[in-house]
Every structure is written in structure tokens, then in C-alpha cells.
């Protein structure tokens, strides 16, 4: 079974398109999404979307702190509710002929393309504990003994979007720099 796991905030302008894109490629059995303070219609769009498809799930509300903190809350809330978690950002998209293989490993990386290419862990074994580290550009790490990871190959790529709410903030880079500086001096 696969559970969609996301954190969102003020994504009403893109969230239905994102969820429709996911459903085209991934058979979801459950979903756990954490909203970090939306003031728009994001939560209603999400719940209506999944209600129409009869896919059960949960929406939770948590105050925003940083990426690792909020992603970890989302992971904890989804723990054990499926065999695997499919982790996705609200403004990302899947292109091509993406197919999830038979899931036997503890983690799977997907290919991101566009101006340059890279891999990101996006599917994890939900019977094991995981933790994100990093206030920005966070990384997920298994917290117990893990089997090997696998890169899902094929004629597809994910696109890391730039249309989410956070990217609309003209002060994003200044705020990110301040957050990194503050975090540096705390350690």
C-alpha cells in the first residue's frame, strides 16, 4: 500500500493540478498531508479531491518552523499507515512514463530533470523510522538498519516546481539566507 505524504501552505492555485498529476502515475491507498498555516482554500481543495476519489486520509495543521521539523511531523503522523510513503512537493510534477516498480527496498530515488538532473528519495518503507535533517534543502535519513536503496529508472522525470506559495515570496532568498545564518550560529 502507498500513502501520499506532503506538507503544504497556501497552494490553492496549484494543489488540484498536483494531486491530479500524482493520481495519473501512482495508485494511492491513503494520504497524510500537513498544512502549515494556509489562509486560502488549500485544505478544502485537498479534502474534496480525495473525497471524490474515495481515497481515505488525514489533514493535519501545524505551525511552520522549518522544512525538516515540519516534514518530520508529517512522517510521524503517517508512520505505519501504509507499506510505503510517496513524498511529494506541492509544486512538483511527474512527466513521461513513470512507473513504480515492485516495492522491496527500503527507499527509492526518482529522477528530477529540467535545467539539470539529480535524484531525490521520494518513496520510503513506512514500517521503518525516518528523519529529515536540514532547515533548507533537507535530506531524509533512515533511523534503523536499512536495505539498499534503488533509483527508479525509465523514460520519465520529475520537475521541481517554482510555482508554489513559497516561490511567490519576493523575500524568499533573503529569508532563506537569514534562516541559514541563524541555524549556523545556533550550532
Located regions from the model:
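Short helix-capping segments at alpha-helix termini
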Residues: 50-56
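A conserved acidic beta->alpha catalytic loop
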Residues: 21, 33-46, 50, 63-64
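Catalytic-site signature of metal-activated, phosphate-bearing donor transferases
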Residues: 68-76, 86-88, 92-187
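Short acidic donor-binding/metal-coordinating loop in glycosyltransferase active sites
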Residues: 36, 62, 82, 88-92
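Aromatic-flanked redox-active Cys/Sec active sites in thiol-based oxidoreductases
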Residues: 8-9, 36
Amino acid at each position: 500500500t502507498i500513502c501520499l505524504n506532503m506538507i503544504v501552505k497556501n497552494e490553492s492555485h496549484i494543489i488540484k493540478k498536483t494531486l491530479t498529476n500524482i493520481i495519473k502515475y501512482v495508485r494511492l491507498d491513503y494520504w497524510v498531508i500537513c498544512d502549515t498555516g494556509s489562509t486560502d482554500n488549500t485544505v478544502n481543495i485537498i479534502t474534496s479531491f480525495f473525497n471524490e476519489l474515495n481515497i481515505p486520509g488525514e489533514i493535519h495543521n501545524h505551525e511552520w518552523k522549518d522544512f525538516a521539523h515540519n516534514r518530520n511531523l508529517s512522517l510521524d503522523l503517517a508512520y505505519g499507515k501504509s507499506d510505503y510513503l510517496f513524498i511529494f512537493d506541492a509544486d512538483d510534477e511527474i512527466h513521461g512514463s513513470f512507473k513504480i516498480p515492485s516495492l522491496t527496498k527500503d527507499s527509492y530515488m526518482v529522477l528530477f530533470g529540467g535545467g539539470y538532473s539529480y535524484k531525490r528519495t521520494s518513496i520510503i518503507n513506512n514500517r521503518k523510522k525516518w528523519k529529515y535533517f536540514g532547515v533548507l534543502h533537507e535530506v531524509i535519513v533512515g533511523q534503523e538498519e536499512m536495505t539498499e536503496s534503488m533509483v527508479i529508472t525509465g523514460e520519465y522525470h520529475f520537475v521541481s516546481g517554482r510555482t508554489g506559495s513559497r516561490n511567490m515570496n519576493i523575500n524568499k532568498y533573503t529569508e532563506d539566507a537569514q534562516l541559514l545564518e541563524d541555524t549556523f550560529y545556533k550550532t
